[in-house]
Amino acid sequence: MGQKVHPIGMRVGIIRDWDAKWYAEKEYADYLHEDLAIRKFVQKELADAAVSTIEIERAVNKVNVSLHTAKPGMVIGKGGANVDALRAKLNKLTGKQVHINIIEIKSPDLDAHLVGEGIARQLEQRVAFRRAQKQAIQRTMRAGAKGIKTQVSGRLNGADIARSEGYSEGTVPLHTLRADIDYAWEEADTTYGKLGVKVWIYRGEILPARKNTKGGK
């Protein structure tokens, strides 16, 4: 049986950057667990704020957290109340000074996390899994994607035997390293158990900068 490598992990260092930007030796395990705690806490606190990527950078006793969100107004709150409260909670959680950057996602229909989250929430509201996937595919293609593939797995329609069913449109070249492919996996809690939702979105190629070869250099 063929197995697929993680599309983002395969491209890190080529066309993708790391989500955690820090270096440590003896403190590596502590920092890693702290990163996981920060991500879990932020995702829980901002479950309805359409947060996609969480980037973490570290300096001496300082943590910079960058939140990529489609709803920056909801994250910031009136007069910055929500982001101040979040910062205070993260300061208490980590025992360090936390700085929060909020980055708006201009095209949420081209973000695999947000598309997958949308499908998962529809499944929880008992929308037919085929309809949820096809509507998401149409929105993503209209937003300018070159291709999209979705897959829902589990007890579909309450069936006794779990299975997977997916749809695709356009092209999704998983083997092309210069292809900008966004991937995400989400869960939907239904009355029949959990359903897994996978989304691959091909947004075009990222070509490396052309080197200047003038003069034979």
UniProtKB/Swiss-Prot annotation:
InterPro entries: KH_dom, KH_dom-like_a/b, KH_dom_type_2, KH_sf_prok-type, Ribosomal_S3_C_sf, Ribosomal_uS3_bac-typ, Ribosomal_uS3_C, Ribosomal_uS3_CS. Coiled coil: none annotated. It comes from the Bacteria. Signal peptide: none annotated. GO terms for cellular component: cytosolic small ribosomal subunit. Keywords: Ribonucleoprotein, Ribosomal protein, RNA-binding, rRNA-binding. One of its GO terms (molecular function) is mRNA binding. Part of the 30S ribosomal subunit. Forms a tight complex with proteins S10 and S14. Belongs to the universal ribosomal protein uS3 family. This is Small ribosomal subunit protein uS3. The lineage of its organism: Bacteria, Bacillati, Bacillota, Bacilli, Lactobacillales.
